[in-house]
């Protein structure tokens, strides 16, 4: 049997020492034993010189159900009464059928003291052991006889027959040498093969020849001899151990020594088998074994605590088993390891955590990427796969969560499944242990103190015109200490060497807290790879700009932009000096409330500063206003409007975080004015919060068709707001925007819609890389643009076919049917011939000049 060798028996089987004679009760099969073992007993043996302990080791005591005695029932164990001389040890013989020689497997037999009642071979003089008095040992041996019971183990004594029949034994307390108890020899315990007179071979043999052959085979010299068969226990049948505190009932006969091989008491192999063999799997996770980083959560308990954690998970997170077991998995969602139930997530994506919660409630499978934090605050991108399993019931009882760090092991993703999930190789043969740095490791106390106070800075600035003073030498230090941007220096390995005092205001960290740490401690785990790659790719003093997400100490992640260059030395690049500032991104959740009727193809969108300076304008400015977008960047939007005072008033309201809509006229490049309606939105905040920039939505209402000039001068009847009148709209009410009532009802039916941002790709806590998201958006835009172009081309072809098959046109004025070109008339359709159309256009133009206003024609 595998797993049992000479070293196992040599270390586990022990024989107590004794010099008195023990008379066992004789059984019905004693005459067989007496006929088969006719050898003499040694005359003398030292009771205190045994080489084996009289107490069994703890391992055997804990697993006694798998250790079996090798003697048969009724064999009298006659202990020697006198010690045997040492010079006679080499001439002793051993019986290969009844004695176990630990060194016989190596090709040699060890001189041992032979005992007719002892089934184990040992040498009393090889390795001296601490002596024990005879009286103490006799008392201990007598006590063991009264308290222990060793059931008999019948076997077939033919060595050619495999040892296939085993008996179920009771617990063995402190010794293997005990008299058999006949009360336990019941019918149910009787084996299928017992001692009898029938030979084990296929042909009959006389009993005398068989006994003589056994005696001849038993006598052997102490030199090298052929190895004999070892008496080995039967392999126990594999059964699942109980899972405390809710054990799983094992099928078949149970053992009182179950789960003695598992320190945790969990049948983890059974758990992984349930994961692999689960019915109707939704996610193909690939191969899993004990090298995976995973946890086991009990969803029947309150707050779904972790009840088992793998060793790889401890190495991945830096937390120990004592710190993990009993907690909910959400403790990894905070840098400090403390996240209360139901609180809003600041450092992770709240939408992803909501999906995880709903998945647990629905008892379904999920795979999602989420920012987690190791012990000490180190972030990492965790790809989580959660799978529910049943355990001895029809209801789901456990959730198995597998984790893998996508940044450190990007090759773990083997392939993409058709349903959007990924097949992950969770096996980690060499997962390094995350070492938590001590708090004082980085506190080298560099020169980060502020040199100049506010009064000293004022003195320096006032004395700049005085050439006799040397204050000009301190201007660089004054600039570094008082700028709003973070001036920082990075080493080639990405370690912070210096941070300006503005770090307290922008990132909420003290400069000394970050100096000595790497950029990965505060950078988004999905952005650290591209950032370091871009910085190291530059080998000259050319400026480099990087945009990434950085974690503030208390407020979560923000977008951050750094611009700088390398400082070169004699050996190349020494460090990089950068200037960083927060990068405010769009937060246009309220744009989702704009109805379909409020958007048009001719709308112009612009990004404005809080004072009205155009920072960006869409390409629709060229066909609508006749101006290139680059021409308008840097100019004031108020200069293009007819009412500058009303525009200033609207900007003042928009700076408070309110949404403002007003009507005005905007100047075309050719000089004429176009009626327009502008809505100012807060750019990077929700309504009610002061923004950093504004977003302007400029729409151009369509004038009513027809040649009535008086109607063209009036505002459109369906406009919600009057000309030059400012309307403030509260945060909770946007009744002036079409489609709001319908959206409000939808939000009431599904509250999750309110949490979805307009641009989900710009959420700072989003787990994916923003570069990848940008490339995907570009691909989607190209696909949509190509699809739109195909539809427009198909529409033109359809119109061309319809025009060829339509009835012949005739001029609405002269009724002619032949003309080189059809022109628009008073109806707005091309129903005038070339000459009539030119005359009508000239009349309209002359009438417009008389009225003193421009005309679209």
From Swiss-Prot:
SMART domains: PAS, ZnF_GATA. Residues 306-328, 479-542, 608-642 form the PAS domain. It comes from the Eukaryota. Disruption phenotype: Reduces the number of conidia. Increases sensitivity of conidia against thermal and oxidative stresses. Decreases the expression of brlA and abaA involved in conidiation and increases the expression of aflA, aflJ, aflH, aflO and aflK, and subsequent production of AFB1, under blue light irradiation. The keyword Repeat applies. A zinc finger (GATA-type) spans 811-836. One of its GO terms (cellular component) is nucleus. Signal peptide: none annotated. Keywords: Activator, Chromophore, DNA-binding, Flavoprotein, FMN, Metal-binding, Photoreceptor protein, Receptor, Repeat, Sensory transduction, Transcription, Transcription regulation, Virulence, Zinc, Zinc-finger. One of its GO terms (molecular function) is sequence-specific DNA binding. Induction: Highly expressed in conidia. One of its GO terms (biological process) is regulation of DNA-templated transcription. Transcription factor that acts as a blue light sensor. Plays crucial roles in fungal growth and asexual development. Involved in conidiophore formation, sclerotium production, and conidial stress tolerance. Promotes conidiation by inducing the expression of brlA and abaA. Positively regulates the fungal pathogenicity towards maize. In blue light conditions, inhibits aflatoxin B1 (AFB1) biosynthesis by down-regulating the expression of key genes such as aflA, aflJ, aflH, aflO and aflK. NCBIfam families: sensory_box (TIGR00229). This is Blue light receptor lreA. It comes from Aspergillus flavus. The gene is lreA.
């Amino acid at each position: 049997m595998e797993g049992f060798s000479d070293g196992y028996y040599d270390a586990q089987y022990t024989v107590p020492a004794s010099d008195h004679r023990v008379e066992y009760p004789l059984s019905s099969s004693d005459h067989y034993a007496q006929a088969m073992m006719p050898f003499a007993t040694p005359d003398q043996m030292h009771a205190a010189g045994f080489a084996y302990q009289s107490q069994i080791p703890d391992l055997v005591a804990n697993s006694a159900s798998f250790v079996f005695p090798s003697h048969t029932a009724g064999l009298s164990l006659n202990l020697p009464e006198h010690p045997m001389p040492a010079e006679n040890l080499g001439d002793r013989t051993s019986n290969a059928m009844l004695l176990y020689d630990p060194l016989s497997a190596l090709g040699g037999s060890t001189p041992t003291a032979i005992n007719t009642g002892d089934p184990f071979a040992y040498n009393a003089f090889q390795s001296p052991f601490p002596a024990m008095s005879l009286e103490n040992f006799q008392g201990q041996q007598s006590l063991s006889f009264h308290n222990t019971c060793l059931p008999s183990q019948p076997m077939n004594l033919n060595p050619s027959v495999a040892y296939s029949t085993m008996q179920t034994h009771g617990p063995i307390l402190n010794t293997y040498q005990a008299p058999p108890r006949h009360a336990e020899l019941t019918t149910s315990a009787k084996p299928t093969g017992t001692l009898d007179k029938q030979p084990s071979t296929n042909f009959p043999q006389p009993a005398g020849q068989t006994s003589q052959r056994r005696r001849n085979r038993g006598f052997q010299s102490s030199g090298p001899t052929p190895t004999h068969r070892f008496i080995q226990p039967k392999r126990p049948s594999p059964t699942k151990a109980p899972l405390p505190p809710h054990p799983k009932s094992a099928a078949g006969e149970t053992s009182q020594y179950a789960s003695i091989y598992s320190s945790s008491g969990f049948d983890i192999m059974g758990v992984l088998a349930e994961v692999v063999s689960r019915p109707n799997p939704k996610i193909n996770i690939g191969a899993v074994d004990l090298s995976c980083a995973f946890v086991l959560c009990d969803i029947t308990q309150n707050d779904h605590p972790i009840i088992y954690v793998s060793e790889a998970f401890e190495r991945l997170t830096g937390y120990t088993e004592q710190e993990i077991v009993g907690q909910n998995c959400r403790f990894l969602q905070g840098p400090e390891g403390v996240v209360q139930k139901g609180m809003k997530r600041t450092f992770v994506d709240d939408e992803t955590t909501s999906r995880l919660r709903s998945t647990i409630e629905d008892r379904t499978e999920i795979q999602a990427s989420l920012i987690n934090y190791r012990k000490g605050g180190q972030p990492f991108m965790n790809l989580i796969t959660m799978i529910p399993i049943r355990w001895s019931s029809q209801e789901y009882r456990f959730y198995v969560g597998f984790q893998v760090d996508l940044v450190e092991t990007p090759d773990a993703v083997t392939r993409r499944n058709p349903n959007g999930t990924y097949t992950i190789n969770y096996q980690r043969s060499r997962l390094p242990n995350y070492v938590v740095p001590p708090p004082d490791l980085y506190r080298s106390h560099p020169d980060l103190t502020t040199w100049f106070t506010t009064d000293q800075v004022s003195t320096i600035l006032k004395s700049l015109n005085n050439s006799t003073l040397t204050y000009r030498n301190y201007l660089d230090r004054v600039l570094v200490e008082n700028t709003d941007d973070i001036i920082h220096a990075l080493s080639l390995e990405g370690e912070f060497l210096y941070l300006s005092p503005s770090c307290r205001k922008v990132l909420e960290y003290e400069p000394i807290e970050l100096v000595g740490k790497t950029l990965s401690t505060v950078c988004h785990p999905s952005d650290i790879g591209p950032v370091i790659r871009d910085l190291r790719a530059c080998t000259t003093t050319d400026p480099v700009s990087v945009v990434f997400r950085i974690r503030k100490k208390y407020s979560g992640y923000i977008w951050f932009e750094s611009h700088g260059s390398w400082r070169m030395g004699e050996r190349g690049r020494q460090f990089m000096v950068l200037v960083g500032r927060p990068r405010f991104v769009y937060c246009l959740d309220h744009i989702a409330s704009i109805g379909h009727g409020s958007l048009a193809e001719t709308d112009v969108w612009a990004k404005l500063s809080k004072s009205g300076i155009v920072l960006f304008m869409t390409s629709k400015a060229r066909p609508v206003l006749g101006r290139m977008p680059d021409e308008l960047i840097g100019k004031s939007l108020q200069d293009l409007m007819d009412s500058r005072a009303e525009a200033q008033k609207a900007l003042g309201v928009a700076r408070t975080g309110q949404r403002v809509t007003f009507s005005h006229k905007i100047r075309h490049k050719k000089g004429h004015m176009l009626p327009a309606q502008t809505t100012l939105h807060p750019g990077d905040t929700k309504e009610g919060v002061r923004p950093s920039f504004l977003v302007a939505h400029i729409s151009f209402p369509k004038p009513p068709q027809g040649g009535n000039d008086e109607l063209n001068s009036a505002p459109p009847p369906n406009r919600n707001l009057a000309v030059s009148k400012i309307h403030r709209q509260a945060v909770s009410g946007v009744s002036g925007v079409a489609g709001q009532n319908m959206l409000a009802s939808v939000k009431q039916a599904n509250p999750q819609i309110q949490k979805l941002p307009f641009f989900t790709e710009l959420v700072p806590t989003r787990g994916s890389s923003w570069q990848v998201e940008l490339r995907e958006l570009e691909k989607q835009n190209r696909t949509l643009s190509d699809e739109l172009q195909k539809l427009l081309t198909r529409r033109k072809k359809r119109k061309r076919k319809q025009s060829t098959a339509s009835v012949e046109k005739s001029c609405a004025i002269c009724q002619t049917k032949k003309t080189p070109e059809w022109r628009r008339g008073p109806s707005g359709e091309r129903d005038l011939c070339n000459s009539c159309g030119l005359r009508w256009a000239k009349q309209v133009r002359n009438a417009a000049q008389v009225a003193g206003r421009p005309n679209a024609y």
